[in-house]
Regions:
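Conserved beta-alpha
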Residues: 1-211
Length: 211
């Protein structure tokens, strides 16, 4: 079967230098981009049901900019003032610098690794007495909690945002696409949530195979 039209279940790249467009030109493909999932913040009511007191904690571990955004969002909605004594531990330098959007950047209270969870070990061990808060999505890896357990550190997980299906009702006919490229199980779940009764044959492409 000759592949002509591909639906990519992600947002359109911001730059024309993306490999997607190189592939499209090389193989004469028509690419359409449509995010199948989106991130929504939990409501104040949902957060309160978790029974997490932000101010009980002396340090926060951030794994992404999204986690930072939703932490300060929920603090604003709860009218919680984060004390200047709060310490921040970030997965990477880029994530740490993003904190400047919300706080004054002070090196003595902001720490970061080199994009890998294991890089955080030495840093965290220097702060054994802290009570850590870990903002997460409803769908998350357990690598950070597992590391904290391994190091016998005190922490609390807080679900501050969630991955939900996008509304795809404007897509009239999935059969017009020769391939639909997925990158997460959530994207596939969104497909069947939007088209529960749609009988068709599709090809799943993993990121390490194509696109």
């Amino acid at each position: 079967m000759k592949i002509k039209k591909v639906l990519v279940s992600q947002p359109k790249p911001a730059t024309e230098k993306s490999p997607y467009f190189d592939l499209a030109e090389k193989y004469n493909l028509k690419l359409e981009f449509r995010p199948f999932i989106k991130v929504e913040g939990v409501t104040v009511k949902e957060f309160r049901q978790e029974k997490v007191n932000i101010l009980d904690h002396t340090a926060i571990i951030f794994t992404s900019r999204t986690a930072i955004d939703h932490f300060f969002r929920i603090c604003g909605e709860l009218r919680v003032t984060v004390p200047d004594t709060m310490k921040y531990f970030c997965i990477s330098e880029a994530t740490a610098f993003y904190l400047q959007k919300y706080i004054v950047y002070r090196k003595r209270k902001i720490f970061y690794g080199d994009k890998k969870v294991d890089d955080m070990t030495k840093i965290l061990l220097k702060h054994k007495t802290e009570n850590f808060l870990v903002p997460l999505s409803d769908i998350h890896k357990e690598n950070i909690p597992a590391l904290l357990d391994q190091l016998h550190l005190k922490y609390t997980k807080a679900i501050l945002y969630k991955t939900v299906a996008s509304d795809l009702s404007d897509i009239q006919n999935l059969k017009e696409y020769d391939i639909i490229a997925f990158y997460t199980p959530s994207g596939i779940k969104s497909l069947f949530q939007n088209f529960p009764d749609y009988g068709w044959t599709y090809r799943l492409l993993q990121r390490n195979v194509l696109l």
